[in-house]
Amino acid sequence: AITDSIEWIIVGYLLWTMSVAAYGGLSWGVAREAQWGTLEQLFMSPFGFGPVMAVKTVVNVLEAFLWGGVTLVVMMAVTGRWLAVDPLTVVPIVALAVAPAVGIGFVFGGLSIRFKRIENAFQLVQFLLIGLIATPVEQYPLLRWLPLAQGSKMLRTAMQEGVRLWAFPAADLAVLVVTAVAYLGVGYAAFHYCQRWARREGVMGHY
């Protein structure tokens, strides 16, 4: 049981690190641009503000992948628990698992454009991510539709039991993909709504 707990902590910490990078890079990025007074300049970009922030988020996640990989090796070496790390399995699962975190980042990035100083809420969400990662999907299957829940379960299974991506049930893969696309899409839509709302209220450049 203790061994399982250690392995769970390793996997959970890895996913949490990735999620915070994906979520925080977007929400905090928008808040910083507003503080520095450069937010409106980004909106005048020919590429559009949303795509610019999305690219920044991808870069943040890639950096998190690098540091997460190093941290994973260190944690496994320190604990003596070597997990299965198949890149063809772990990378796609992590990418799809953190997509809802990007969606949440878009939501709070949009809210920070409209309501400005909400950084305290950003910190609370980081703790909420821990709860989502620890969701007991096995006991309560309906909870797998929550952000990060299904990805966390599948990542634990892949790394603790050595299950390959193509060996997962089709239903599990479907839930992972649907939740990733749905939360990311809803978050991006909410971001654009808040952006237009801020422009209508004339508070885009205020902080």
Segments the model singles out, each with a brief description of its role:
Residues 28, 36, 40-44, 109, ...:
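Short amphipathic alpha-helical coupling elements at transmembrane boundaries
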Residues 112-153, 157-158:
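Transmembrane helix segments
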Residues 49, 54-116, 173-178, 182-188:
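Alpha-helical transmembrane segments and their short interhelical loops
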Residues 6-76:
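Hydrophobic alpha-helical transmembrane segments of multi-pass membrane transport proteins
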Residues 5-9, 13, 86-93, 119, ...:
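Residue-level signature of transmembrane alpha-helical entry/exit and packing/kink sites
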Residues 18-26, 98-107, 132-136, 187:
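Transmembrane alpha-helical segments that form the membrane-embedded catalytic/substrate-channel core
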Residues 178-207:
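Junction motif at the cytosolic side of a transmembrane helix
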Residues 10-18, 90-103, 126-131:
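Small-residue-enriched core segments of transmembrane alpha-helices in multipass membrane transport
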